[in-house]
Amino acid sequence: MLTRMKTASLQGVNGYPVTVETDLHRGMPGFQIVGLADTTIKEAFNRIRPAIINSGYSFPREKVTVNLSPAGKPKEGSHFDLPIALGILLLTLGEEAQTEDTAFFGELSLDGRINPIRGALPLALCARKAGVHNIVLPLQNCEEAAVLEDVNIIPVSDLTQAICCVKDPQTTVPYKKKKRVEEAHSDLDFSEVIGQEYGKRALMIAAAGDHGILMMGGPGCGKTMMARRIPSILPRLSYEEQLELTGIYSVAGMLPEDEPVITSRPFRSPHHSISMAGLIGGGQKPRPGELSLAHRGVLFLDELGEFEGRAIDAMRQPVEDGFIRLNRNLEEIIFPSEVMVVAAANPCKCGNLWDEKKTCTCSSAQISSHMRKLTGPFADRIDMHVRVAQVAGKDLKEQEQENKGMTSAQMREKVVEARRIQEERYRGMPHRENGWLGESDIIRYCLPDQDGQELLRQAYEKMGLTMRAYWKICKIARTIADLEGKETIGTPEVAEALQFRIMEKEMRRNGA
């Protein structure tokens, strides 16, 4: 006797289809699971047997063999409890059921209740891609998965309810979403930032082209305040991006109960003591790190020079590629990491190096050591470098007169329009923002006109720029032109873009 139940297993933040085959045959009573199951799945017998008995059913006296197909791929997760238990019950009761169009996920407690699971949305997505139209999930996970279209999400609270769904599918009622998916309102607005018009302009350019940006300035000048307001000017998440982000947070076990669908772009600000695994992801059972949790949003690295060197170096490739590739137990796991990196740092240990009103107490050796940390390979990959000064007295006076400059709503309008232009230009390409272009695409789309190229050539020689910096200036100039609605990149756009690499030369000189 044999039953087959459809389910799925996670591989990173994605799933792949799994068929649970359950067989009863004569022999010594026993329970065996084959198919590269992890410890959690192998322990399933100790949950399934009491759950079946405490639900009023009898556990078979025959030998039970469970095969997880495909047998050659590693599998993990307690959500296999439900399909295994249902397969055993169908064989014990002698029932025949049509389960080809249904996938099952759920962890069993000893009394037969079905507990919530991690990764419900990516598992349900996998089932939908496999052609399944009915997905049975724990009740607590249904709000998360109900965002999916073209499938029926069927909630179950206990094993008895689940077996009824299998025996008599006509009686099941699909889950109806309770909450309307809307973007969470942000109380942070750029109009609250006094002065710093240069910094706000730089952040708007960075947001428009998805460029990384490094802000340097003394303590209290507003670096963190401005960084925390960046999500308020980024475009709203699309439906596909919401699914992608919700899946990442679901796998990480960080999906808020009151917000089962991620509707706002994430802002992650890890402490500088974070480990390499915490930053890029990993572990014995790989989980997304801060880079992936900030996917499609902002990763803010405050006090960049204080982060562990190994952790920062490990970010170089993922930040450029937009994904993290890990290898565990002969298995390749990929986590997404398309983030806007925003870093902040003081120019020296005391923070007063560039302050005209305060005296720097650092020695030349301390300044050089600090600057070397900020001019390494990772910082070189950040497109824009911005010097943030202390707020001037005249800016305070303008604030009193309610001359607050642009609001986040006004800045977002410009950013959204610039992103729209880029999306049309790069239609059919892997990335849709200027910040992600490679050299060949930069040559095709981002070279300035003749006068602009001459200015850029002169700057390249006088400023001692690297070729990487040269290409980054072209990308920034392209974004500035998009913000201004210009098709051609001219001298004004190149001149403004050059401002965002001037600080690099000063940093290298101080670090020499």
Where are these predicted regions, by residue range?
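P-loop NTPase nucleotide-binding/switch module
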Residues: K167-I205, G209, R236-L291
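Catalytic P-loop NTPase motifs of RecA-like helicase/translocase cores
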Residues: D111, L301-E308, G351
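Short beta-strand elements
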Residues: V18-L24, L279, D383-Q390
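Walker A/P-loop
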Residues: L214-P256, D321
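Walker B catalytic acidic pair
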Residues: R296, D302-E303, A314
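Peripheral, non-AAA+ core regions of ATP-driven protein-machinery
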Residues: M1-L214, C221-T224, I262, N327, ...
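Basic, amphipathic alpha-helical bundle interface domains used for macromolecular binding and assembly
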Residues: A37-F45, P60, N67-G77, P286, ...
